[in-house]
Amino acid sequence: GKPICGETCFKGKCYTPGCTCSYPVCKKN
């Protein structure tokens, strides 16, 4: 399945591949 970008981003970094930080959560790149 595709990664879900819903984690909170810390210092502009997202742990899920293909996601970017749109504070305060990660969004699909």
UniProtKB/Swiss-Prot annotation:
Disulfide bonds join 5-19, 9-21, 14-26. This is a cyclic peptide. Transmembrane segments: none annotated. There is a cross-link at residues 1-29 (Cyclopeptide (Gly-Asn)). The keyword Disulfide bond applies. Keywords: Disulfide bond, Plant defense. The presence of a 'disulfide through disulfide knot' structurally defines this protein as a knottin. Belongs to the cyclotide family. This is Cyclotide mden-C. It comes from Melicytus dentatus (Tree violet).
